[in-house]
A protein has these predicted regions:
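Active-site-proximal structural scaffolding
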Residues: 17-21, 65, 97-99, 125-127, ...
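Catalytic and substrate-binding clefts that recognize carbohydrates or anionic sugar/phosphate headgroups
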Residues: 44, 48-96
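Extended, loop-rich substrate-binding clefts of extracytoplasmic carbohydrate-active enzymes
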Residues: 77-127
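Structured core elements
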Residues: 14, 27, 36-37, 73, ...
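Short acidic-glycine loop/turn motifs at beta-strand connectors
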Residues: 30-31, 39-41, 76-77, 136-139
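Beta-strand-rich N-terminal accessory domains
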Residues: 1-66
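Acidic, contiguous internal or C-terminal segments within carbohydrate-active enzymes
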Residues: 110-154
């Protein structure tokens, strides 16, 4: 099965299905701040030291599940979905993930609404930025509820290794 392709012009790897065998990760970073972002918006962020200064929660032994991360939820009527498919796993009408040099763009489409989530770490700043762009091509007016979720950790790796799973 083919999961994506290289876009040489834009210097990106384009993933065309969220259901890859394992999370496909892009490493984003500046001098001090780093984020690892998967093709379904999973991953984690840390400041200088991934073991001692992790900012968001991530369990290494759960990595095939890829549930913790940088998630955007969109509620359209009774349907809740994510541009990166996880964690709701709501079937999308279309999906792409573009892992580029210093950024990841996830784009999902559901019921005429396209959501594009761009994640990047700006050079010289110790932060991650998420930019969400919504477009309604459904032909009807929509009222959407949109919210983001990230599991904040402020802990070190040893604390997560001793948790019960």
């Amino acid at each position: 099965m083919r999961f994506g392709h290289f876009d040489d012009q834009n210097k990106e790897y384009v993933i065309t299905t969220p259901q890859t065998p394992l999370p496909w990760i892009n490493y984003l970073g500046s001098e001090d701040f780093f984020s690892l972002v998967s093709n379904t918006a999973g991953g984690y962020s840390f400041y200088r030291d991934a073991r001692l200064r992790r900012l968001t929660r991530y369990r290494y032994n759960s990595s095939p599940l890829d549930m913790d991360g940088h998630h955007i939820y969109i509620k359209d009527g009774d349907t809740v979905w994510n541009p990166g498919w996880q964690p709701t796993k709501t079937e999308l009408d279309s999906y792409t993930c573009r892992h580029g040099l210093g950024y990841t763009i996830l784009e999902g489409r559901k019921n005429g609404v396209t959501a594009q989530q761009e994640l990047f770490v700006p050079k010289g700043d110790a932060c991650e930025l998420d930019r969400l762009t919504l477009r309604n091509d459904s032909g009807t007016e929509k009222e959407l509820d949109v919210f983001s979720y990230v599991a904040v950790s402020y802990t070190h790796l040893r604390a997560h290794e001793t948790e019960l799973h």
